Amino acid sequence: GFNCSRNQEVAKKYAHLSAKLGFASHKASDGDKLGALLEAIVKLQRTLECPMTLTEFGVDKATSEPKLNLMADRALEDMCYRFNPYPANHDDLIGLYKKIL
C-alpha cells in the first residue's frame, strides 16, 4: 500500500504486475489485483519467517519512538528515497514508522 494509495499510476503498475504474476485475473478490478499482490507478499514474508514489524525484528519500541523524527530525517536524506514512486514527506514517514513499530 503506501505508494499505491497516493499515486494511481503506481497502483495501476502494481495491479498489472499482480495479474502478470498470476495472483489475480487480468479481468479483476485493480483493487482486487492489488489486494491479491499484497496477500502474496505477506504470505511470502510469513513463509520466509520475515519479521512483519520493527519490533519483531528486535527494535525496541520504547527506545525508537523518541527517535522517529531523526529516523524520518535520515530517510529523507537517503539516496534511495528519490526513487520512491511517491514523494513522502516527513509526516508521512513518521506515520509509516508508527505503523511498523
Predicted regions and their residues:
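C-terminal charged capping/lid subdomain of soluble metabolic enzymes
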Residues: 11-101
